[in-house]
């Protein structure tokens, strides 16, 4: 059974319900005959991917939706083999090079070179170039981004790149200057409520406006999250009213539990217990930066105002370490230990 977030996903630019001006801009780009490289950025759950798939459909027609998943093997200079999944149609490829970590340069170089040197298979296609959609472009290493820049310069007649990112801050200037930047802003609370009402109508659920408003506020303007929360409410309750509780995601509840445990006891034994829970979150594919950010926001209301600036400083410090390092668990654990030390020192100063 498909989730409503997938089942009701708009398939064309006409079906998109908000940012209509942006949809019109994308349509005119697709029809112009001179489609540029795009860098599409904005917060999670704003609809970047949905808009790009709809734009590809405008570019090539319904054939874009006939996709398959290919497993490819790439070899590094040290003869290490990397297995990598590619989502592909006749007209486009979709890749997430950050899945292979620091070896993303190998994937970017080899795959894009191969695609760019291949002519369009479908001779009746509207466009003579192929499109490569790169997810999480802001997580690419500097080497991979440099390889990407060279590919953009060399193979632009046969290849167009669409980069998806949450922020442009981590993308090198030469790539930004070669792309048309498209910002997809997060939907407003009202726009989220309208989408929830539309989904309820399609599913035959009663429209509960108070619940829609609460979900829109709790989702942090993340439409994907709002739809998942909405479905969770209906999955767990037979009768839904304005006051029906909204269940938090399991990972968020676990981080809340970690925050309480950190506050209760400041010992090496407690750090070991917390480490096990952090490992659990990481093995369930929760990104380390999200864990750190959520944990910080859970801890902030529990501490005195005098400590808040210090805790936020160290959270930012270890977030930078996570982004530049490879063993994320070290930096998460270091933040927990640092917080315990700061809090313990504060308690000792209070006793004096």
From Swiss-Prot:
| CC annotations in GO | Ctf18 RFC-like complex; DNA replication factor C complex; Elg1 RFC-like complex; nucleus; Rad17 RFC-like complex
Question: Which biological process, per GO, is one annotated for this protein?
Answer: DNA-templated DNA replication
UniProt entry keywords in alphabetical sequence = DNA replication, DNA-binding, Nucleus
Where is this protein primarily located? Answer: nucleus
Q: Which InterPro entries match?
A: AAA+_ATPase, DNA_pol3_clamp-load_cplx_C, DNA_Rep/Repair_Clamp_Loader, P-loop_NTPase
Membrane-spanning segments: none
Kindly name one Pfam family recorded for this protein. DNA_pol3_delta2
- GO molecular function terms listed in the Swiss-Prot or TrEMBL record: ATP hydrolysis activity; DNA binding; DNA clamp loader activity
Query: Subunit structure of this entry?
Result: Heteropentamer of subunits rfc1, rfc2, rfc3, rfc4 and rfc5 that forms a complex with PCNA in the presence of ATP.
Tell me the protein family, please: Belongs to the activator 1 small subunits family.
What's the name of the protein?
Replication factor C subunit 5
Which species does this protein come from? Neurospora crassa (strain ATCC 24698 / 74-OR23-1A / CBS 708.71 / DSM 1257 / FGSC 987)
